[in-house]
């Protein structure tokens, strides 16, 4: 029951009606029997500053930020975590002592989803497909302990991102980059961060051919609708282990949840709540 002591968290973006975040967060809240509620707010860019001020005034515990505000929100925050600053995007804000503090949990969400399948990720050869916003967070996190190659249809964009991450992480060996015609046979992990294959455009060619994939490779697609996008169907044909975007969605959400509440939510409860709605 909502009352004067209910703690508020939520999602800010445009649009937000497609989001599964309220479903999984409220499922975790119900499971833990804590007096929180998670709401989704459709917010235009010109209102971002007022929304941050309003969240402080109404004593929100925090909120998630989704497309298209992950970068623009940063100028209205009081503090930004060093990783989020380096990534150049924020997806989680905590309100504490009247201050709005920004974090980015997208990269750690992918890492945790992968480690659920592979164990600890160290010195793996990882191929990242795409160089957009999702790729930035994922590449930054995974490049800390692994050997990354970023590829994109526009090679210049892949080059720029790889050089930026190498510089920010002070990498002794710079990240590699290339085009979509890359030889994939030596990669342990391949991650698609592009929207190719997302509903409703599901009947498309995989973003890169996978016929030369390493026998024991792990292939991940950040898409979660459909649950098995064309990229993963193709990877499975060649014997790869596959992971869809549900894992990333849930784990990044779980890290956000813990930032706000100080409590680790049940990953299974969150995942089950989403799958039941797809």
UniProtKB/Swiss-Prot annotation:
Q: Is Acyltransferase given among the entry's keywords?
A: no
Function, as annotated, reads: Involved in the biosynthesis of the chorismate, which leads to the biosynthesis of aromatic amino acids. Catalyzes the reversible NADPH linked reduction of 3-dehydroshikimate (DHSA) to yield shikimate (SA).
The protein's name is Shikimate dehydrogenase (NADP(+))
Any GO BP annotation: chorismate biosynthetic process
Under the heading CDD domains, the entry gives:
NAD_bind_Shikimate_DH (cd01065)
Q: So what EC number does this one have? A: 1.1.1.25
How is the subunit organization of this protein annotated in UniProt?
Homodimer.
**Catalytic reaction(s) noted:** shikimate + NADP(+) = 3-dehydroshikimate + NADPH + H(+)
Question: What superkingdom heads the lineage?
Answer: Archaea
Q: Which UniProt keywords apply?
A: Amino-acid biosynthesis, Aromatic amino acid biosynthesis, NADP, Oxidoreductase
GO molecular function per UniProt: NADP binding; shikimate 3-dehydrogenase (NADP+) activity
- Alphabetized SUPFAM superfamilies for the sequence: Aminoacid dehydrogenase-like, N-terminal domain, NAD(P)-binding Rossmann-fold domains
Catalytic residues identified in the record: 70
The record, for Pfam families, names: SDH_C, Shikimate_DH, Shikimate_dh_N
**UniProt: NADP(+) binding residues:** 130-134, 222, 245
């Amino acid at each position: 029951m909502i009352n004067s002591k209910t703690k508020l968290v939520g999602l800010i973006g445009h649009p937000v009606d497609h989001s599964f975040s309220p479903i999984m967060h409220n499922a975790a809240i119900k499971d833990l029997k804590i007096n929180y509620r998670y709401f989704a707010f459709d917010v235009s860019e010109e209102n971002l500053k007022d929304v941050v001020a309003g969240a402080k005034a109404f004593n929100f515990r925090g909120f998630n930020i989704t497309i298209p505000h992950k970068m623009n929100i940063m100028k209205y925050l009081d503090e930004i975590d060093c990783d989020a600053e380096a990534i150049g995007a924020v997806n989680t804000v905590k309100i504490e002592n009247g201050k709005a503090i920004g974090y980015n949990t997208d990269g750690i969400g992918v890492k945790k989803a992968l480690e659920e399948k592979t164990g600890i990720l160290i010195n793996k050869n990882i191929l990242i497909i795409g160089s957009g916003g999702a790729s930035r967070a994922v590449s930054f996190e995974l490049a800390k302990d692994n050997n990354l190659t970023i590829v994109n249809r526009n090679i210049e964009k892949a080059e720029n991102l790889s050089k930026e991450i190498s510089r920010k992480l002070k990498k002794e060996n710079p990240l590699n980059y290339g085009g979509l015609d890359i030889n994939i046979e030596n990669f342990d992990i391949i991650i698609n961060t592009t929207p190719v294959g997302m509903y409703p455009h599901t009947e498309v060619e995989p973003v890169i051919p996978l016929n030369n994939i390493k026998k024991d490779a792990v292939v991940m697609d950040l898409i979660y609708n459909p649950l098995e996008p064309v990229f993963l169907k193709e990877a499975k044909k060649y014997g790869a282990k596959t992971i869809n975007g549900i894992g990333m969605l849930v784990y990044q959400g779980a890290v956000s949840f813990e930032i706000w509440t100080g409590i680790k939510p049940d990953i299974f409860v969150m995942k089950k709540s989403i799958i039941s709605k797809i």
